[in-house]
UniProtKB/Swiss-Prot annotation:
Residues 925-937 have a biased composition (Low complexity). The lineage of its organism: Eukaryota, Metazoa, Ecdysozoa, Arthropoda, Hexapoda. Pfam families: eIF3a_PCI_TPR-like, PCI. The gene is eIF3-S10. InterPro entries: EIF3A, eIF3a_PCI_TPR-like, PCI_dom. This is Eukaryotic translation initiation factor 3 subunit A. Residues 317-498 form the PCI domain. One of its GO terms (cellular component) is multi-eIF complex. It is found in: Cytoplasm. Its main location: cytoplasm.
Length: 1149
């Protein structure tokens, strides 16, 4: 492993470089370091790690390193099983897909290796013959063992690793079951029976593990319905594969698992699942040789199909009932002594085994042949079955006709076997056995002895050995008294009168009792006859006893009637109370469980969120630390690479451990390198000096001493070789002489047999030549016939190919035309979409231009309002001088510059004259100019009060207010208050331009006329407001107000806690208002007249009204409109100022 940590991107690039130069093992090691180093593995996202993982698994598959792939998969699961389950699923599925593709390629390669034979005429080469003789395998088996089996083993290990990886993870539960089904398909495809057994055991162990209680919230819980359904589907697939592979023990275990899962589930399984379960269970019982439970399973399947399946045809019902009936009739007759099995040492008794099998079928007790026949009759199966099977039931279970029994049953069996695809063929042997046992029982009731040949003629489908075995089995299992006399060729029945055959009544048709049965029941019959005689002699005795007993019972009933009735009622009440209590307890328990589940889910969610937050923080911290560490290690790596370039540096790095290198810095390593280089130089010098002394003396002396020894050894070797050759030559000559003599003797013996050999050779040659000629003639005829047949097939095949080619061309032409039409439609739709998009773009451009013009106009308005405000501030001193010169005017009331009326004159004017105030002011342009100039100026303590919004005394903000009209008397006038209290007594006091602001609720409290002693500041005049502090808000402009609501509702304002109304309080539900004071739409505001702001008439500054520039048409006079009529919204927007100088301003949101 490398000493240095690389970034994942660099590791992937490095691995690709190794792959390009043909070193996949080095590439795998490079990628493996990414998952081994855990410092920063959890800091990277799946977008970085997932490509590395795919390349890592690809290399593992290529090199068949399943254990290395397992290590990487476990690390990847720990990283992303909580963050991105989809990435983990993609990685595992990709890994298994790669392994399956490689295995299929190996299988094709193995098959191709057999076809790639050089000489087809000489298939059996000497090598193949020797290999088949040694190992007992053919060429295909050997090819599979060398090419296919390694990949099959790798794929099997991959499936097992993935199942172990995902066995307890609830997030990957679907993937776990998909892999299990893929493993079943793998075992079925490659016929791996041993692996299938191991897989079943592994899945069963996993199911046991998840059935245990676990405290981890991410684990799989068997109590969830989804988990139960997934396991049930997997076990059904397992059962199907086991049946196809004929592993009946594994199929039975799978059935037990399926039954356990269905029992564990709270809801009833689907009928389709139950039908499949009973069908497979019946097949397993039949393969196990248990015909009784096989018939019971078919009966349960019939009941389920009839009750649950809709639109069942009559043919299907007849087929199912016939199957049930014939399976029930094929059950062997029960043994008279089943307790014999208890003498056999087994783990469980037959009764326990039968009870266990009955539980799999949902039965309370094990079935029997008699009970199944009764159930068949009760469910009307006999009447719904085919007629021939109804007759079969009548012949076997009802009628007593031993002479024609086998012949009748033989006809039904021949009818069944005539159809090769009939599902009833498997029952023929069992029906023959049952028929023969019935025949033996019926013959035993008719004959005491019968000739064996006569008995064999009655059994149409049995031979002598088979019939003798049936007789022996009847004696063993059914406790019949049968003796076979082989000397006289006869059979005797019921010869021992002292032994009875069975105590219970035998099933099936009977004619009379056996002699031994009559002897056994003699005392019982005597007792019955004596009781009848006593009843005949004294018939009243029993009647009197019955009457006395009846009276006693009536008396007891009358005495205990009320008590028993009350006891029954109390019992019923207790039962009802108990039911209600149980229901209430169950309901409370369910609610408690639901609350606990919700609380657990909430806690789990919170814990998961906290965990994710902690992981993110930890990941960020580690990432920061890793970046710093990587910078340090990169510098260290550069230094070490420089040191590696020298031989001394390489030796130094080999001597130092990895841990020591991590603790050292670059300077220390350089010092170590210099020290090591100095040591090597000294050692090299010393070595040269010592070698210089040894070479001249030791080598020359050694060579001089060994020269005579070598010469002596060569002389001795020459003498020994000569003696050995002489001995071998003498022995060879002797053996050749002996072989010559033996060959001459053999030649003399064989010369006497030469004539006989020639005769035998000529005879054998003639016989073989004739046989060869006959075989050659037959072969040539067959060859000619096969040639004609293949030529005819080739003609038909070519004709069909031409026809299919014509059909394909026709279909392609049709598809081409449809494709052209589709493209044409798409082109038209695209042109239409582009046209609509262009129209929308042009419309949007128009709207944008309009909005820009409107925005420019609003900016112009704001600029003009600001200039007007500056002009008002400049004229404020002159207005104060004119007000002082004009008199008090009511103590602080606001007046226009053109208002010259005296205060006394204003006070003397009656307040009921307020309706005519507007008509009196209209001819005075100077007064109107002064009023309009003063309109935006009212403030209270530095806070702008919107003119004409609320009037004092109109109720609390947000309350329902009556609509304001011109004919309603102002509240202040009705109460006798002065106009000074309402905020001014100038010429604009009684103009009905909208709701008035609430004045008098400021910091000073309500101010009354003549209350000068309570206010030290004196009378308030225009411009005498106190200086503004930093926290005070300046007067608000009209364009500073927010959007108005739809429907004309007024704005809601919050004036900074100075007593004003909040934005959410100022509702106005008064409805439409007339003339200038009426409400406009939600986006239309009223603007005061702007001409002659500096005291002039309509002449001086009238050009500054931009609304007048847009509309040259004069406003419609008030007299020409009806009273209370409000101009339409469109007319107001385009008409300009009205007769009072007010203008509708459109507010854009």
């Amino acid at each position: 492993m490398s000493r240095y940590m690389q970034r994942p991107e660099n590791a992937l690039k490095r691995a690709n470089e190794f792959i390009e130069v043909g070193k996949p093992a080095r590439a795998l090691d490079t990628l493996q370091e990414v998952f081994r180093i855990k410092k920063w593995t959890y800091t990277w996202s799946e977008a970085v790690i997932e490509p590395i993982m795919f390349k890592y698994l690809d290399l593992c598959v290529e090199l068949k390193k399943s254990h290395i792939a397992k290590e990487g998969l476990f690390q990847y699961r720990n990283m992303f099983q909580m963050l991105n389950v989809g990435s983990l699923e993609n990685v595992i599925r990709g890994y298994l897909k790669m392994a399956e593709e490689r295995t299929e390629a190996a299988q094709q390669q193995s098959s191709q290796a057999i076809l790639d034979i050089d000489d087809l005429d000489n298939l059996a080469t000497p090598e193949s013959i020797l290999m088949s003789a040694v190992c007992g395998e053919d060429a295909q088996d050997r090819s599979d063992r060398t090419i296919l089996l390694p990949w099959v083993k790798f794929l099997w290990e991959s499936y097992g690793q993935c199942l172990e990886l995902l066995k307890v993870n609830s997030h990957c539960e679907n993937l776990y079951h998909d892999i299990a089904k893929m493993a079943f398909a793998f075992c079925l495809k490659y016929n791996r029976k041993m692996e299938f057994r191991k897989l079943c055991e592994k899945l069963r162990k996993h199911l046991d593990d998840i059935s245990k209680v676990s405290s981890q919230t991410a684990n799989v819980s068997i109590s969830k319905p989804e988990t139960q359904q997934l396991n049930l589907d997997t076990r059904l697939n397992q059962l199907d594969c086991a049946i196809q592979m004929e592993l009946w023990l594994e199929a039975y275990k799978a059935i037990e698992d399926i039954h356990g899962l269905m029992t564990l589930s709270k809801k009833t399984p689907m009928p389709k699942t139950m039908a499949l379960y009973y069908q497979k269970l019946a097949m397993v019982f039949w393969k196990a040789g248990n015909q009784l439970f096989h018939a019971a399973a078919l009966l349960k399947l019939f009941q389920l199909s009839r009750d649950m399946k809709k639109n069942v045809t009559q043919e299907e019902i007849q087929r199912m009932t016939s199957h049930v009936l014939i399976a029930t009739l094929a059950i062997p007759l029960p043994s008279a002594h089943p307790e014999f099995d208890r003498f056999i040492e087994t783990d469980k008794s037959p009764l326990e085994k039968a009870q266990k099998l009955a539980v799999l079928l949902g039965l309370q007790q094990p079935p029997s042949r008699v009970s199944l026949l009764k159930e068949v009759l009760r469910l009307n199966v006999l009447q719904l079955a085919a007629p021939q099977f109804q007759n079969l039931y009548k012949w076997l279970e009802v009628e007593f006709d031993p002479l024609n029994l086998c012949s009748r049953v033989q006809g039904v069996i021949e009818e069944i076997t005539a159809d090769e695809n009939s599902p009833y063929t498997q029952y023929t042997q069992a029906l023959q056995d049952v028929t023969l046992v019935r025949l033996v029982r019926q013959v035993s009731q008719v004959y005491q002895s019968i000739e064996f040949s006569r008995f064999l003629s009655l059994a149409k489908f049995a031979n002598s050995f088979y019939l003798e075995r049936i007789l022996v089995d009847c004696v063993r299992h059914n406790d019949m008294q049968i003796t076979i006399d082989h000397r006289n060729h006869s059979v005797h029945f019921g010869t021992d009168l002292s032994e009875s055959q069975r105590e219970d009544h035998p099933d099936g048709p009977t004619l009379q009792s056996m002699p031994s049965e009559q002897v056994r029941s003699q005392l019982v019959n005597m007792s019955v006859v004596l009781h009848r005689a006593i009843a005949t002699i004294n018939p009243n005795r029993k009647k009197a006893d019955r009457e006395r007993l009846r009276n006693q019972m009536v008396k007891n009933y009358e005495e205990n009637m009320v008590k028993d009735h009350q006891r029954i009622l109390q019992r019923q009440k207790k039962i009802e109370d108990r039911k209600e209590y149980i229901e209430r307890v169950n309901l409370e328990r369910e609610e408690l469980e639901q609350r606990q589940l919700e609380e657990a889910a909430r806690q789990q969610k919170l814990a998961e969120m906290r965990r994710l937050e902690q992981e993110n923080e930890e990941r960020e911290r580690k990432r920061h630390e890793n970046e710093i560490q990587m910078i340090k290690e990169r510098n260290m790596k550069d230094k070490i690479d420089q040191i590696k370039q020298s031989a001394s540096g390489q030796k130094l790095l080999k001597k130092i451990d990895e841990e020591d290198i991590k603790k050292m810095n670059a300077e220390e390593i350089a010092a170590k390198e210099a020290e090591e280089r100095q040591k090597e130089r000294k050692a090299h010098d010393n070595n040269l000096k010592s070698q210089e002394k040894k070479i001249d003396y030791f080598e020359r002396a050694k060579r001089l001493e060994e020269i005579p020894l070598i010469e002596k050894y060569l002389e001795d070797k020459l003498v020994q070789d000569k003696e050995f050759w002489e001995k071998q030559e003498a022995s060879r000559i002797e053996a050749a002489i002996a072989e010559r003599k033996n060959a001459e003797q053999v030649q003399e013996r064989l010369r006497r047999m030469q004539a006989d050999r020639d005769v035998f050779w000529q005879k054998l040659k003639g016989e073989r030549s004739n046989a060869f000629a006959e075989k050659l003639k037959v072969f040539n005829a067959a060859l000619e016939e096969e040639r004609r047949r293949r030529l005819a097939e080739r003609v038909i095949q070519r004709r069909e190919e031409r026809r299919q080619k014509w059909l394909r061309e026709k279909e392609e032409e049709r598809r081409r035309i449809e494709e052209e039409l589709r493209k044409q439609r798409e082109e038209e739709e695209r042109i239409e979409r582009e046209r609509r998009a262009e129209e929308r773009r042009i419309e949007n451009e128009k709207q944008r231009v309009i909005m820009e013009k409107q925005r420019a106009k609003e900016e112009e308005i704001e600029r003009k309002l600001a200039e007007e405000k500056e002009r008002l501030k400049e004229r404020a001193p002159r207005g104060e001088k004119e007000e002082r010169g004009g008199g008090g005017g009511g103590g602080g009331a606001w007046r226009g510059r053109g208002d010259t009326a005296a205060p006394a004159e204003s006070a003397a004017k009656p307040e009921s004259d307020w309706r005519n105030a507007r008509e009196a002011r209209e001819p005075a342009p100077e007064s109107a100019g002064a009023s309009s100039a003063a309109a935006p100026a009212p403030k209270k303590d530095g806070v702008w009060q919107p003119s004409g919004r609320f009037r004092e005394g109109r109720g609390a903000p947000g309350a329902d207010r009556p609509p304001r009209g011109d004919d309603r008397e102002p509240p202040a006038a009705a109460a006798g208050e002065s106009k000074w209290r309402r905020g001014g007594g100038g010429a604009d006091d009684d103009k009905d331009d909208g709701p008035r602001p609430r004045v008098g609720a400021g910091d000073r409290g309500p101010m009354r006329r003549g209350d000068g002693d309570r206010d030290d500041r004196g009378p308030m005049r225009r411009g005498d407001r106190p200086p503004m502090r930093d926290g005070d808000r300046p007067g608000m402009r009209r364009d500073d107000r927010g959007d108005r609501r739809e429907g004309g509702a007024p704005d809601r304002r919050d004036f900074g806690g100075r007593g004003g109304d909040r934005r959410d309080d100022r509702r106005d539900d008064r409805g439409p208002r007339r003339e200038g004071g009426g409400e406009r739409g939600g986006d239309v505001w009223r603007r005061a007249p702007q001409e002659d702001r500096r005291g002039g008439a309509a002449g001086g500054e009238s050009g500054g009204n931009w609304r007048n520039a847009r509309q040259a048409e004069p406003a419609k006079p008030r007299e020409e409109r009806r009273g209370g009529e409000e101009r339409p919204k469109e007319a107001r927007a385009a008409a300009g100022p009205d007769e009072d100088g007010w203008t509708d301003v459109k507010h854009h949101r």
